[in-house]
């Protein structure tokens, strides 16, 4: 993260390590949702990039959150915003599934889904895409 960079996080199990592992010093910023509000990361990154042109903005988002509000990337395309979006793709609402497995072992419901081709989606929004598997 750049010395004045902004990191936006979405809700989800993938984001928890970021809270502990990424050191922040002013004027760096981390923008994250309260109470598990999925879909926060991408719109927050777009807003941060619009508000602070010239500052590096990186978004960490799960595939579930991306599918909820990822269409906001159209604004990034339209405005030529240099966002970096890192997507954790596991095909499930991980936090919800963990709670279901705890309360109803072996009976998760409605937590898995099939993603579109996220690499193709990123390219469609004009982003250079690198897949790490």
Give the predicted meaning of each segment.
Residues 17-133:
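Thiamine diphosphate
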Residues 1-13:
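Active-site pocket-lining segments that scaffold enzyme catalytic pockets across diverse folds
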């Amino acid at each position: 993260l750049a010395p004045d960079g902004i990191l936006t996080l979405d809700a989800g199990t993938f984001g928890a390590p970021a809270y502990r592992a990424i050191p922040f010093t002013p004027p760096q910023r981390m923008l994250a949702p309260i109470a598990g509000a999925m879909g926060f990361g991408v719109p927050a990154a777009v807003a941060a990039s619009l508000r602070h042109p010239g500052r590096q903005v990186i978004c960490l988002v799960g595939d579930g959150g991306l599918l909820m509000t990822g269409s906001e990337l159209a604004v990034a395309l339209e405005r030529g915003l240099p966002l970096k979006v890192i997507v954790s793709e596991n095909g499930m609402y991980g936090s919800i599934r963990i709670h279901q497995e705890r309360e109803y072992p072996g009976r998760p419901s409605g937590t898995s889904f099939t993603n579109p081709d996220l690499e193709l989606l990123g390219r469609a929004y004009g982003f250079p895409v690198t897949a790490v598997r």
